[in-house]
Swiss-Prot record:
The gene is matK. This is Maturase K. The keyword Kinase does not apply. GO terms for biological process: mRNA processing; RNA splicing; tRNA processing. HAMAP family: MatK. Keywords: Chloroplast, mRNA processing, Plastid, RNA-binding, tRNA processing. It comes from Arabidopsis korshinskyi (Rock-cress). Belongs to the intron maturase 2 family. MatK subfamily.
Amino acid sequence: MEKFQGYLEFDGARQQSFLYPLFFREYIYVLAYDHGLNRLNKNRSIFLENTDYDKKYSSLIVKRLILRMYEQNRLIIPTKDLNQNSFLGHTSLFYYQMISVLFAVIVEIPFSLRLGSPFQGKQVKKSYNLQSIHSIFPFLEDKLAHFNYVLDVLIPYPIHLEILVQTLRYRVKDASSLHFFRFCLYEYCNWKNFYKKKKSILNPRFFLFLYNSHVCEYESIFFFLRKRSSHLRSTSYEVLFERILFYGKIQYFLKVFVNNFPAILGLLKDPFIHYVRYHGRCVLATKDTPLLMNKWKYYFVNLWQCYFSVWFQSQKVNINQLSKDNLEFLGYLSSLRLNPLVVRSQMLENSFLIDNVRIKLDSKIPISSIIGSLAKDKFCNVLGHPISKATWTDSSDSDILNRFVRICRNISHYYSGSSKKKNLYRIKYILRLCCVKTLARKHKSTVRAFLKRLGSGLLEEFLTGEDQVLSLIFPRSYYAAKRLYRVRIWYLDILYLNDLVNHE
């Protein structure tokens, strides 16, 4: 394994030629095929974790495929004829898809090593838990309670594919890899219908890598300017991917930036800034005044439009005052709530009460959007009244019950951190009654008659693991039930979100 590590080092011109291992290094295929990156680096690749790797994509097959395509001169195929031209029994589009997958795997290897390099020599405990979606909420509860404003930014997508190619140029020195990458990208996609007709056949792993490269380019500039202008040392930039000749290019850019926009650079000197990116959006929390928040807003607009050539409207940047507005974050509605606290103090023979006010981040369930999602999937109507799931009546009773129980437990598992469980109980009620109506419709019976025949054992299946455990911890009393209603639990094993219906 140490031998593999030597060939995968990021530094050096030879390692920048990404087509070199694709063509000549057979043993690198094993690393890419069985996700051997976790052996080289304890922090597995983000790209490998976020997407499913289909076993049919073999690096050895792709290598042989490229050689045969060169021999038969089949590379030059018009995009409109991709589906009509067959090659070895498959359409040419299928082979471009295979090549794109393996290209992404090979390019991920040095980036994965660079991602883990800042953690070398540091003790990072429970790094797996840091990948959880819920791990960000305890951080926000601790930090956002001291901030005034939050900037909610929708990260724009590059419309033209050439912008993605130009972004990758900063990191890849190998010209042949770039030309091959551009060729496959244009042949694989009809870029005029990039988000419509070709969406079903696009490879998620390939374009996830392109999107992350584009976003990391933006974040590298943002954090670099903040680090250069701040008096406090920022360590957030360490986990970002540094592009080739980055400092030389940014120093020139910073010089122009200072000469033309000295006032805008001044706003970057605020050391109390927290930045979080999620689901194509980013959140910037700070203690600044409304005037400075508006400057931040137009700074992002100018950065995207002038430097990245991406059309970006100011309406995509929302300024939220946490004490008044709700921040929609990862399926929760977060806002600051004043929590009154009465403390009894006693000095010698005198006792008195002290009224304190504690600012707390309140995370609530967006019941309207969840009911809208349930209505879209035919679990209820738009008013939240449960209806039978007609498309599931052909399945067996156990299959229907398991589907509803799985969906109910997933929702309960994710929204267990809500400060108030009333909306969560309402969602559970909708799913339970929808399950009963679906089973009653299958057996051509009424809901009351079906429940009378089956008993209460059906509803016990919907009890989640946390409900059963907490009911054993707290005694069955009014105050215990009220305490259970307010218990907030954040789980550190939730790495991604799935569709409600299609999740298996």
